[in-house]
Amino acid sequence: MTNIRKTHPLMKIVNNSFIDLPTPSNISSWWNFGSLLGICLILQILTGLFLAMHYTSDTMTAFSSVTHICRDVNYGWLIRYLHANGASMFFICLFLHVGRGLYYGSYMFMETWNIGVILLFAVMATAFMGYVLPWGQMSFWGATVITNLLSAIPYIGTDLVEWIWGGFSVDKATLTRFFAFHFILPFIIAALAGVHLLFLHETGSNNPSGLSSDTDKIPFHPYYTIKDILGALILILALSSLVLFSPDLLGDPDNYIPANPLNTPPHIKPEWYFLFAYAILRSIPNKLGGVLALVFSILILALMPFLHTSKQRSMMFRPISQCLFWLLVADLFTLTWIGGQPVEHPFIIIGQLASILYFSLILIMMPLASLVENKLLKW
């Protein structure tokens, strides 16, 4: 008799995705982040669901309802901090996952990569709207500043901003719709992640060498299930440590002050995972130029397959490209640091140089380095 997992319509999908899936035998721990992102998403949906049971999306009561969750709800503080810091872990895994894709040339799977870029935008939008919900000072002013960027769009900008606000400023209507969008988007993300996996399983996984692994495949279970469980335990350990020992480490103290439209905080800045993009935005003196640079700083990922000039897929055997890749990583750390600093000398010029370097590395230096490496192959 054939095993039920190979015949049952639903079990068959699970079997072909997580059990009998032929997987390259040499994929490293850098391939763990897909499953970790799945765990993060499930955690965020569950904690978010329980938070939504006690949260009220009204300007008068939003801040108080979050305080009520932390003080009066059983383990409410734990759920709230798991959700807030879970977002940070989500982005750490996302950045490492994207970095892995860039290093090993996984972007050559075009459909998988493009859905990944859409997923990145969706997660960033979700995180931004979630940050507005506690209705603290940084929530309110962050929402005001970021939504206001759309006013830079010629002709329709101002109308567009007022349409998103649902009025002439960030107010009750804005908070209510942000809560609605923040609730629905994770389910859209889950669906997109399913499509992401669907396209990945059409081609099979890439591997560190960038060479075809068709001749050497092993079943996903038990080899990679046990490996993913180890990754999950490390993720849970890191998240638990953050939540239980320093839950406010990555947050902004200003968000413990209720939103006040009459008092602007001295330094408006987003959560740490947006700082690199925020630094690029601020480094351009022109409003529309800054917005375009901000969008393009993420959208540039979609161009990666077209900027690939090397004869090899992976960077494993390309030392010049490796150096430039790690320079790009260092540059992103620099941009993240600058994004959290006030707009004054010398931070302005450092931010501008780091922004120029970011685009130069991706658009000019890395494709040229690949061409040089192609020549070295012949030499």
UniProtKB/Swiss-Prot annotation:
Tell me the superkingdom of the source: Eukaryota
Binding residue positions for a ubiquinone: 201
Q: Other notes on this protein? A: Heme 1 (or BL or b562) is low-potential and absorbs at about 562 nm, and heme 2 (or BH or b566) is high-potential and absorbs at about 566 nm.
Database matches in PANTHER family = CYTOCHROME B (PTHR19271:SF16)
Originating gene: MT-CYB
- Which species is listed as the source? Mogera wogura
Write the protein's name: Cytochrome b
| Molecular function per GO | metal ion binding; ubiquinol-cytochrome-c reductase activity
Q: Which cofactor does it need?
A: heme b
Per UniProt, the keywords (alphabetical) are: Electron transport, Heme, Iron, Membrane, Metal-binding, Mitochondrion, Mitochondrion inner membrane, Respiratory chain, Transmembrane, Transmembrane helix, Transport, Ubiquinone
Positions contributing to heme b b566 binding: 97, 196
